[in-house]
Amino acid sequence: MDNGIAGIDHIIIGVRDLEAARRQWVRLGFTLTPRGRHIGQGTANYCIMFGRDYLELLGFVARDEHAHRLENFLAQREGPMAVAFAPGRDAAATAAELAARGLHPSTPRALGRALELPEGAVTPRFSLLNLPPEETPALDCFICGQLTPKLVRRPDWLSHPNGVVGIKTVHLVADDPAALAPAYRRLFGDDRVAATLNGVEIDTGRNRLIFARPSLSGTDGPPPAITALELRVASRDAASVYLKNAGIAFMGLPDGRLAVSPAEATGTSLLFGE
């Protein structure tokens, strides 16, 4: 039975200074969209668009008494804070498919943001739904349907000097990864959740989630948390040359991936691999 989820739509990265974050990620070799302002809220974002998914740098630009999730996260740290999954068709259809699996999705709700383009503001719109925390344990997530995809995927926003082309894997830490498996089998299906020596690996449809114990994740932060974002590059060698020329501190791992420390990316550990 299809669960109505077609992989990851985007990753939210919470930042304390949105403009400083923009400069930092441009230095890392990413092309950023113009700034978007969430309608009726004190939050704004810059997005890093790929062909099928993206990264969202999210921060405050005004006082917001309702954005408690972001406020609480930033009181502790910066970095990746949530995963948004993509619906296979639309949020309403995904809600029906999840309910048919015995899950408890919320009613889809609307969200819009004013995107500040040189020729004037446009309004990308989205349809969001949530699942109860116990149905996606150790993961802050929701489902985000793109209602106006052409507004946010302009060709010139999809090309990045560092050669990144998409999200490959989200690495997470949890106290007991094996205990998470039943919930994610219910969400994604038995054939898409695998126990590993280090924890649990989940096939979301076009990306992976990997949960590991703190001692195996290499993170100093308390679980549960996203510990690293693994991004796919067109050429690892070209990415290495770009990072060297930009003065970005990174190291090569034994498996060939390139690791950029959180200090270079607003609290986000980045892995670049083919």
Predicted regions span which residues?
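Glyoxalase I/VOC metalloenzyme domain signal
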Residues: 1-8, 13-32, 50-111, 115-274
